[in-house]
Amino acid sequence: MQPLTRTICALFCLLLTLPLTFGSPFELEPRRNKLKIGTRIKQRRPTYAIAHMVLDKTGVKDAIKHGANALEIDVAAYRGGWWADHDMKAKSKGWSLESLFQVIAKENKHIAFVWLDLKTPDMCTGKKCNKKVLQPSKCKENEKCSMKSLQQLTRKYLKPAGVRVLFGFYKKHHARSAAFDYIQKSLGDGEAVCLSGEANKVMEIFKKEGSKIKPQRRVMDYGRTELPNGFGDCNEKGGKTCAELKNGAKLRQKGDLQRVFAWTSHVGEGKYVNKLLDKASVDGIIYGFAKTRYYHHKDTEKSSKDIIDRVKKSKSRYMVTGADKLW
């Protein structure tokens, strides 16, 4: 074979191997597009529509049908264990948490986390209160009414299913309770603590009473039962709902908090939802009835739709699924 012929053959073989090594030139543009799409997804903020006062199986199923990707459950301790219970009165009692968690675990593709709103660091003392409700801080660790028992239930049913857990403490003095102290010392994978209040006060509590809780497990919430009351215009320095949540979002950006949630949006309050998502930059919103357990109704469905529709229109947000990791 002549030298020139050999050279031509060698160059031809080299050209044939280039697509195998570096990819075809025709594939480069689609590959660039995929990278751009992946980058955009990472930059979008995961968003949560959190169904309010889910106390039974019906509430779980209906919330999922409405598009909820997280559930807020009010919980109270009884001698026989933990129950979904909003105000510790006979009419508000729902399912046992053991039964409810089993239902939720099966819906792990839809539910990213469960927010356990602890009602019993404070005791209900009125005449109408259920005297069977116990103070978990006074229960021994091996008793079913203890905080350890509650945590074990979440780890038995929710953790294996990949459903995250948020332990919510509503009042400032709850952070000085034995229940709070136990949880902060025993936080595990997929678990976080939420404190309710103004941004600077929440941070103060986390730094003092909750110093063992890492920033990646700190969550703040703020709101009102009637969202329009004290909402503000989002431009105040603080003291109003939107402004305080906006302050919380700034702390999140600094790395002091992991998530910031607002509450509670009802039907017809879409303009407030828009401001919470667009101006306050919250991570999620509790929605639903103000004082009634969750169930299928045009009002719960519409209030869920307010959140979901706004997220769909946004280029900077997406609705979370059970596959997303919050903390």
UniProtKB/Swiss-Prot annotation:
Q: Where is this motif: SMD-tail?
A: 320-327
- Name the needed cofactors: Mg(2+)
Annotated Mg(2+) binding lies at 72, 74, 117
Residues annotated as catalytic: 52
Per the UniProt entry, the signal peptide is 1-23
GO terms for cellular component: extracellular region
Q: What does this protein do?
A: Catalyzes the hydrolysis of sphingomyelin. Sphingomyelinases D are produced by some spider in their venoms, but also by arthropods such as ticks, or pathogenic bacteria and fungi. They might play a role in pathogenicity through different mechanisms, such as membrane destabilization and host cell penetration, but also pulmonary inflammation and cutaneous lesions.
Q: Which family does it belong to?
A: Belongs to the sphingomyelinase D/phospholipase D family.
Protein name, UniProt field = Sphingomyelinase D
